[in-house]
Amino acid sequence: MTGGPSQIDTWDPKPDMPREVRGPFATIPTRLPGVRICEYLPKQARMLDKFTLIRSVDCRFSSHEPNMVMQTANVAADPGTNPKARMYPSIGSVVAKHHGANKPGIPPYVVLNLKSRSHIAEGGYLGPQFNPFNGDLARQALHLPSGLTMDRLHERRSLFRQMDKLRADIDHSGMMAATDTFSQRAFEIIAGGAAQEAFDVSREPVAVLDRYGTHDWARQALLARRLVERGSSFVTIDLSNHSNSGTWDTHGDNIPPYGGIWNGLRPLLPVFDHVITTLVSDLDERGLLKDTLVIAMGEFGRTPTLGTQGSTDGRNHWPIVMSMCMAGGAFRHGQVIGASTRDGGDIAERAVTPGDLAATIYHHMGVPLDGTYTDHQGRPVPLIERGEPLREII
C-alpha cells in the first residue's frame, strides 16, 4: 500500500476522539466482538474472523523510497542514514534463496504493478539472481522473438554453457556462478512454458474474471493467486496508481496528486476492500489459504491529527505506529494484536517490529531464523537482527 495508509482511517479508528483526530469516516462493527473498523471496509468487516489486525507496528526509521526497513526487516537499512541500504536483501529475496519456487519453471519471487523500481527492495548482498521478477514485463519477456525457435534456443543455451565454463575457470569472484544460476533459471522459465501459462490471466473462467473485476489491483491480485497456485513462493503487489511516492500518501487536497482523507483515501478503500477479501476468499475456496500468507501493509502510519502542511483534510507521515492486516498461512486468525494510544499516535501495547514480521514470514516459509548471509567484506549478517514470530497467531 505504497505511500502509507492512515491507521486511524482504516483498521484503528478513534470514534470517541474529536473530529480533527477521528477524521471524516464513521466506523462499523465486525465479526469480532467489540472490534470496529472504517465504514468503507464492509467486506473485510464481515469476514474479519479470517484476518488478524495488528495495531501496534513499530515503523520507526521507515521511509517512502526506497522502503527498505519494512521490506528487509532491518532498521539499519534506513536509506536516510545508511548509504548501503540497498544492499540489505528483501524478505522476498531471502525466501527465493532459502526456499526457492514451489514448482520448476516458475520465478520464486515476483513483483506486480511495479510503478517504480525504487519502491521495491531487491537481492542486495544475496546477488542479482535473487532480485524479483518483474511480472509486468512477463508477456514480452516469456515469449521467443520472431524467428527464434525452441530448438535454436536450446542450441544457443548449449553454446553459452560451454563459454561460461571457460570463463568460470578464470573467475575468482564468484560472479560467474551467480550469473550461471541466473541464466539457468531464466532458461527454465522461458523454455518450460509453465510461467507463460501462469501469467496469462485470460485463461481464467469468465465467472472468476467477473468476480475479481477489471480494476488493475484486482487483476494483479488474480495474477498473484495464479502464480502462487502454480509455484511462486513470494509475490508482492505494489498497490499504487502513481509512479512516485505512492497513492496512499494522503497529505491533503492541496498537495497533489494524492488528495486528503476524504477525496484521496475514501475512493481507494472500497477497491482495496474488494481486492483483499476476494483474494482471501478465492484462496480459501481453492484450499490454498492455509498454505498462503496474505499481508497488506504500507511503510508507516499517518499523523493522529488532520491538517498537516497547511492542509485541513490530510495527514502527514508518521513513522511511529502503523496498522496492518494478515490472513492465511495456517495461523490462528480472528484477533487484534497490540493497541495504539487514545489518539492513535503511539504504541500503547505489544510493539510489533519489522523483525517480528519477517520472522513470522520466515517461520511460515521454513527459512531458518538463525540464518545468515555474507556482506561484501565476507562478514556474516543475520537474516533477522531482532525479531520473533508472532506468538499470538502460532
Label each residue range with its predicted role:
Residues 1-394:
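Ligand-binding pockets and gating/stacking loops
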